[in-house]
Amino acid sequence: MENTTHLFLAVRFNCNKCHDPPFERWTQDQYYSLAAFFSQIGRKEDARFLGKKIGGSAVEGAKPLVEVIFNSGAGEVTHLRTSEVAAPSFPYEHEDTIGEEVPRLEKLAHWITSSDNQYFASSYANRLWGYM
C-alpha cells in the first residue's frame, strides 16, 4: 500500500501505520482505510518458475522469482491501534460511481485515476517534469 500511494499519489504513508505523524495531514485511520483495499490480494509462486528464488539474507528469506498476484475475494485488515477491522474508504470525500459488486482494487484504481483526484494529477505532472 505504501508503494502505491507513493507512486501514484506522491504521498508517503509509511509512518502512519504506527502513529499519526505530527507534521502530516494524513492519519493512521486513513492509512488502514486505504490498506483495506489491498487486503484481498493473494500471491502465489508462478508455476513456470517453481523453485527459483530471489534475495534472501539472515534477516529476510528468499522470495519466489516470479509471483502471480490475484484477487482472493477474502481477507481484512485490522487497525493496529483499535484492533478493529478497517473498512475500505478513501482519505477524503469522493463520489463513488462504481457499484458494490466491483472488487476493492478496481474501486481504488478508479479513485486514484479519477479527474477529481488532485494528488494523481500533480504526481504524474511532477514525474514527467522530472524526466525532461
Model-predicted segments: where are they?
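Sequence context surrounding c-type heme c attachment/ligation sites in exported
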Residues: 1-63, 67
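Short, functional "switch" segments adjacent to catalytic/cofactor/reactive centers
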Residues: 38-132
